[in-house]
Amino acid sequence: MLNAFDQAYHQLCEEILEIGKQKNDRTNTGTISKFGHQLRFDLSKGFPLLTTKKVSFKLIATELLWFIKGDTNIKYLLQYNNNIWNEWAFEKFVQSKDYNGPDMTDFGHRAQKDESFNLIYKDEMNQFKKRILNDDDFAKKYGDLGNVYGKQWRDWEDKYGNHYDQLKTVINQIKTNPNSRRHIVSAWNPTEIDTMALPPCHTMFQFYVQDGKLSCQLYQRSADIFLGVPFNIASYSLLTHLIAKECGLEVGEFVHTFGDAHIYSNHIEAIETQLARESYNPPTLNINSDASIFDIDYEDLEIVDYESHPAIKAPIAV
């Protein structure tokens, strides 16, 4: 048996495997892809942290709080031992004139295929992380990912140099004009795509208020179904909870709309392992603080009664 959250995710995986089309991609890994899909999660029924594999709430929550703070430097993440953005910052460093270590060309693919190189890569990455944490000048130069999510959410800059806090504006709109159809935040800033370590995959989200409940719909242009989507589901569900609390509302639905929904060819075995599992009951979320969303800390958030199958490892496509 599957709970409703895991079932929706499993059905998407099965549909992509069954009818998806093979496509090449930016990373040259290869994918099975489907264009256009939608999932709906009733957040009053629990918190959609998948149970058919262990998903780290700490990584999800600290990344979301990083976005909310408007931060774009991995130093904050590393302080929580959150490594999910490391490869993009590391890539910038090893391509710079300041790097004089072993050849790191195509380190992502090489580390998967060559164990001796993988050991060298891990050592270089560990040294890089230590420098980010302990050297402010180095962190400022090589820890910053450019104008990624946090910058666009909190400090969108137009062509005239005006700065716009989208997230704060939307929260104020929800409080003062809940029936507006303009509760939208966009991370897709066409004029700044080239300044980002990775163009935003989850590009735009909209809030909807009905009967005292706040719902959120995310449009995700590019969706890594195995590694990324379980995080995205939980992240935007958490964001909905935080903003609902900020605005004195209950939670409604999280609606997840996909553009290119894909399974990487080197994730298929991992997906099949997950699909063979039964689920547990979903956990619940506690927000143990009345602080503003902009002042919430990770320690204020609590996942209750989370039971899951073991994590399943798979390589990230850089």
Swiss-Prot record:
Pathway membership: Pyrimidine metabolism; dTTP biosynthesis
Residues given in the record as (6R)-5,10-methylene-5,6,7,8-tetrahydrofolate binding sites: 224, 317
E.C. no: 2.1.1.45
Molecular function per GO: thymidylate synthase activity
Keyword Cytoplasm: yes
First-tier enzyme category under EC: transferase
The UniProt record lists the keyword Methyltransferase: yes
Catalytic activity: dUMP + (6R)-5,10-methylene-5,6,7,8-tetrahydrofolate = 7,8-dihydrofolate + dTMP
Annotated compartments: Cytoplasm
Record: residues binding dUMP: 26, 181-182, 221-224, 232, 262-264
Coiled-coil region(s): none
GO process annotations (BP): dTMP biosynthetic process; dTTP biosynthetic process; methylation
Keywords: Cytoplasm, Methyltransferase, Nucleotide biosynthesis, Transferase
Residues forming the catalytic site: 201 (nucleophile)
Entry-linked SUPFAM superfamilies: Thymidylate synthase/dCMP hydroxymethylase (SSF55831)
Subunit and interaction comment: Homodimer.
NCBIfam families xrefs: PRK01827.1-2, thym_sym
Family the UniProt entry places it in: Belongs to the thymidylate synthase family. Bacterial-type ThyA subfamily.
Protein name (database record): Thymidylate synthase
Species annotation: Staphylococcus saprophyticus subsp. saprophyticus (strain ATCC 15305 / DSM 20229 / NCIMB 8711 / NCTC 7292 / S-41)
